[in-house]
């Protein structure tokens, strides 16, 4: 599953495209949309599925590169991540800047400004931790950037994990010690140990600091990414499951895991005690099992179900859907649209998908696969980021603190919801 295609030495290694993984993305982002629309209690668990997928895919790519070149080209890896993630993020932030300048209430501008700066720096999750933001009250006084905490955790992973893999590769001095198999063994041990530490911290910090620290912390959510990492290492070591009985067993367990995740999505509310007493970990392991069953060469019933066109089509644009949906949901509020319930949800989702498709077709794909700047990427992206920051600062520049004692209702609500 994770073997690179035949490539000359020192070229980029690839892994084969698997439609079922697009379907998993589609199901995950659909859950998030339904949760933020107020129609699925546990739809937020889609984020954990994204974490598992990221750990699996990135580690598979790194192992494929090691197998092909006995090397990890960090600069090329980070450049690919930048081309994949930053253009759409910049477009979203420019949209938020326009919203702040033209629509947002004045008392919200400072909040948006600080959220935007944290988003650009990919530390939004830690801003949420240290500001005391309660995620489960985000519908009360929403910022259009409340959803970027998970993007921050992903980006931190993209920066740190390739360095760890490079270090694990360097532990082998020569020959077989530097093979993809040898590195996969080290990755597996590392993932299991760090995953256990992350799970322990999640349990301990919930007792010490409460749910928000656990929900937002990189250290307390890392076990989901590490579950995907461990799966990638296992598949690299063991290969695909081809024998009939083990394949059937994996399919049955995979279907059971998918049903478990579905039940959790319908029943597991965000402040449920079980969520922080092993529930998030169990859902991450279940997601990893679903991925394992879906990537086998001979498609089974689960893989075929996840490969249906509506899910895979949504999965292809899932990054844009996730990125744009929350600012659009905040903009298309009941007060502005005079809609409620399912009619409001349908309008919000329709606009989100339209924007995501346009972004995918005219921003993300051209930059990712075709267009290359005439000057170095190391100049283009920092310059673009600086322009986005300037636009955000200008868009949120109208804030003035209200006179003493004259706090508006929105401001009071925001202050109660977020100790910022």
Which residue ranges define each predicted feature?
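Generic short amphipathic/hydrophobic targeting helices enriched at N-termini
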Residues: 1-2, 403
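Membrane-interface helix/loop caps of multi-pass membrane proteins
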Residues: 2-375, 381
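Membrane-interfacial segments at transmembrane helix termini in multi-pass membrane proteins
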Residues: 370-383, 405-413
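Internal/C-terminal transmembrane anchor helices
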Residues: 375-402
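Membrane-interface segments at or immediately adjacent to transmembrane helices
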Residues: 394-420
């Amino acid at each position: 599953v994770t073997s690179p295609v035949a490539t000359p030495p020192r070229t980029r290694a690839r892994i084969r495209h698997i439609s079922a993984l697009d379907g998993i993305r589609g199901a995950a982002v659909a859950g998030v949309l339904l949760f933020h629309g107020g129609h699925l209690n546990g739809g937020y668990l889609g984020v954990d599925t994204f974490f598992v997928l990221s750990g699996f895919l990135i580690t598979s790519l790194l192992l494929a590169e090691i197998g092909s070149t006995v090397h990890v080209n960090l600069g090329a890896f980070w450049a690919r991540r930048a081309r994949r993630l930053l253009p759409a993020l910049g477009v979203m932030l420019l949209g938020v800047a326009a919203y702040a300048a033209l629509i947002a209430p004045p008392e919200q501008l400072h909040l948006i400004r600080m959220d935007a700066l944290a988003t650009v720096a990919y530390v939004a999750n830690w801003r949420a931790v240290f500001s005391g933001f309660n995620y489960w009250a985000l519908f009360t006084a929403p910022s259009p950037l409340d959803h970027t905490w998970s993007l921050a955790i992903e980006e931190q992973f993209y920066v740190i994990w390739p360095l760890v893999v490079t270090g694990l590769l360097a532990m082998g001095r020569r020959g077989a010690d530097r093979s993809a198999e040898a590195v996969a063994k080290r990755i597996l041990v590392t993932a299991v140990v760090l995953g256990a530490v992350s799970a322990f911290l999640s349990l301990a910090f919930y007792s010490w600091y409460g749910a928000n620290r656990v929900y937002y912390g990189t250290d307390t959510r890392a076990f989901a990414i590490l579950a995907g990492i461990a799966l990638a290492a296992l598949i690299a070591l063991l290969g695909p499951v081809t024998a009939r009985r083990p394949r059937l067993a994996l399919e049955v367990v995979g279907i059971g895991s998918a049903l478990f995740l579905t039940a959790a999505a319908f029943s597991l509310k965000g402040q449920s005690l079980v969520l922080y007493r092993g529930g998030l970990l169990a859902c991450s392991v279940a997601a990893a099992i679903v991925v394992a069953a879906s990537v086998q060469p001979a498609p089974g019933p689960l893989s075929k179900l996840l490969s249906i066109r509506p899910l895979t089509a949504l999965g292809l644009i899932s990054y844009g859907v996730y990125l744009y949906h929350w600012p659009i949901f905040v903009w298309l509020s009941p007060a502005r649209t005079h809609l409620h319930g399912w009619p409001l949800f349908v309008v919000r989702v329709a606009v989100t998908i339209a924007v995501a498709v346009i972004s995918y077709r005219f921003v993300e794909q051209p930059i990712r696969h075709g267009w290359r700047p005439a000057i170095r990427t190391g100049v283009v992206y920092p310059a673009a980021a600086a322009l986005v920051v300037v636009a955000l600062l200008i868009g949120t520049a109208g804030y003035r603190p209200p006179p003493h004692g004259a706090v508006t209702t929105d401001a009071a609500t925001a202050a109660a919801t977020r100790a910022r």
